[in-house]
Amino acid sequence: METILGMTAIAVALLIGMGALGTAIGFGLLGGKFLEGAARQPEMAPMLQVKMFIVAGLLDAVTMIGVGIALFMLFTNPLGAML
C-alpha cells in the first residue's frame, strides 16, 4: 500500500511540475513571438494581441486539466483498489 501511495505522490508531483514548466516555456515563447510580430508590423498589434490571449487561455487550460487529474489521483487514488 505504501508503494502505491509513494508512486502516486511521485506521479502527482511530476504531473504538476512538468505542467508548470511547460506552461512557463509556452508563455515565454508566446510573449516573445507576440513582441516580435508587433515590432515588425505595429498595425497588426491589436489583432495579434487578441490571438495571443486566446492561445494563452488554452495554454492555461491544459495545465488546469493536468492539475485536476493530479488532484483526482491524489485524493481518490484509483490504484488503491488493486490491493
UniProtKB/Swiss-Prot annotation:
Q: What function does this protein fulfil?
A: F(1)F(0) ATP synthase produces ATP from ADP in the presence of a proton or sodium gradient. F-type ATPases consist of two structural domains, F(1) containing the extramembraneous catalytic core and F(0) containing the membrane proton channel, linked together by a central stalk and a peripheral stalk. During catalysis, ATP synthesis in the catalytic domain of F(1) is coupled via a rotary mechanism of the central stalk subunits to proton translocation.
Q: Which residues cross the membrane?
A: 10-30, 52-72
What HAMAP family does UniProt report for this protein, alphabetically? ATP_synth_c_bact
Protein name stated in the entry: ATP synthase subunit c
Q: What is the lineage of its organism?
A: Bacteria, Pseudomonadati, Pseudomonadota, Gammaproteobacteria, Alteromonadales
Entry's localization field: Cell inner membrane
A GO biological process this protein is involved in? proton motive force-driven ATP synthesis
Family membership: Belongs to the ATPase C chain family.
Q: Which organism is it from?
A: Shewanella oneidensis (strain ATCC 700550 / JCM 31522 / CIP 106686 / LMG 19005 / NCIMB 14063 / MR-1)
Q: What's the name of its gene?
A: atpE
